[in-house]
């Protein structure tokens, strides 16, 4: 045993699993926004929330060549998690989505950002795949 975590896919990462679950409910809630916001705020919420998982997956795939590439994509995912906090604040302040739900999701994205930062600073090198 090498001491490395048993992670063979981006889907094995806890941060990916969490970042995948949150947008499912958020997507449904965004569909309830006004028609005028469907092409603006709602669309941005759907894209930014899903880009977190996309960046984790893309970075994980590129880590075979470079841990620096993986880390770069983790930074982009973290940026999207921070961006989501802004969009959710707008939804709350404009009374588009229940304030308690928005605060819950903002907490989730804060936690996801912390997890991504932790992976960036300590775990990205440990996950580097060398056995293929």
Cite the ranges covered by each PLM segment.
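Amphipathic alpha-helical assembly/interaction segments
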Residues: 1-132
């Amino acid at each position: 045993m090498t001491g490395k975590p048993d992670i063979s896919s981006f889907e094995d990462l806890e941060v990916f699993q969490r970042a995948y679950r949150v947008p499912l409910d958020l997507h449904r809630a965004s569909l309830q926004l006004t028609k005028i916001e469907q092409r603006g705020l709602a669309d941005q919420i759907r894209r930014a929330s899903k880009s977190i998982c996309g960046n984790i997956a893309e970075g994980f795939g590129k880590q075979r060549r470079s841990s620096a590439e993986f880390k770069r994509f983790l930074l982009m995912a973290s940026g999207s998690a921070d961006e989501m906090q802004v969009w959710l604040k707008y939804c709350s302040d404009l009374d588009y989505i229940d304030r308690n739900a928005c605060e819950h999701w903002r907490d989730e994205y804060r936690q996801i950002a912390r997890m991504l930062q932790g992976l960036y600073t300590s775990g990205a090198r440990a996950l580097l795949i060398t056995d293929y």
